[in-house]
C-alpha cells in the first residue's frame, strides 16, 4: 500500500505465471538492500504463514520462537531480525490470476498507534411491555506511518481508505527515512 507504491521502497521479485518465484531469505536481503548503508534499520519482517514456511524451506534453520499470541507468532533469525507471522489477507494478492506474496520489512518506529478509551453510554427505555436498555459505545484511534502522510480531507477513514495506496503520500525525501520496504514474491497474472 503506502510502502509498495514507491519504486525505491518496493522490490518485485515475482515471476511469470509459469515460473513463480518462491520467497527466500536471499530475496528478503534484496529488499533490505533498498536501504543501502542503512539496511540494518530494518528490524522486522511481517509475512503470512505460507511465506514464512517457504523461507524456512530455504535456509531458516536456526530461528528462535520468541513467543506466540493467538495465531500470531514472533520468531527471530540468527541475524537478530524478527519475523512476525500472521495470515494477514493484505499480504496476498490473487487479482486476475496472480499469486503474489508480499513481505514488509519495517524499521523501528515504522507505525504509531494511539487509541482513546472506549466511551459507553446506557439508557433505559421505559413505558413498554418489557424493559430495555440501549447501549452505545465509541472509540477512536490515530495511526501514523513513518515518512508518509495520509491524504488531506479524508475524515474518519474506513479500512478500505487506509489500505488504498493513493491516499498516502511519502513526505520523507529518502527511503532510509521511511517505515521500510516491501518485497514481492510469487507470480504475476498471465
What are the residue ranges of the model-derived segments?
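Hydrophobic alpha-helical segments involved in membrane association or supramolecular assembly
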Residues: 41-43, 48, 135
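Sequence/fold signature of self-assembling virion shell proteins
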Residues: 12-25, 29-30, 50, 54-190
Amino acid at each position: 500500500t503506502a510502502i509498495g507504491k514507491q519504486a525505491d521502497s518496493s522490490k518485485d521479485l515475482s515471476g511469470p505465471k509459469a515460473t513463480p518465484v518462491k520467497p527466500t531469505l536471499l530475496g528478503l536481503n534484496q529488499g533490505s538492500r533498498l536501504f543501502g548503508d542503512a539496511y540494518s534499520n530494518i528490524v522486522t519482517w511481517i509475512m503470512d504463514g505460507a511465506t514464512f514456511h517457504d523461507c524456512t524451506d530455504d535456509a531458516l534453520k536456526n530461528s528462535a520462537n520468541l513467543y506466540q499470541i493467538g495465531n500470531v507468532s514472533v520468531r527471530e533469525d540468527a541475524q537478530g531480525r524478527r519475523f512476525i507471522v500472521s495470515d494477514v489477507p493484505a499480504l496476498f494478492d490473487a487479482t486476475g490470476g496472480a499469486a503474489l506474496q508480499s513481505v514488509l520489512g519495517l524499521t523501528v518506529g515504522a507505525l504509531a498507534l494511539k487509541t482513546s478509551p472506549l466511551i459507553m453510554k446506557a439508557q433505559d427505555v421505559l413505558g413498554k411491555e418489557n424493559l430495555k436498555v440501549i447501549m452505545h459505545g465509541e472509540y477512536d484511534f490515530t495511526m501514523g506511518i513513518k515518512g508518509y502522510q495520509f491524504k488531506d480531507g479524508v475524515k474518519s477513514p474506513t479500512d478500505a481508505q487506509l489500505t488504498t495506496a493513493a491516499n498516502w503520500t511519502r513526505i520523507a525525501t529518502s527511503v532510509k527515512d521511511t517505515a521500510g520496504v516491501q518485497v514481492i514474491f510469487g507470480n504475476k497474472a498471465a
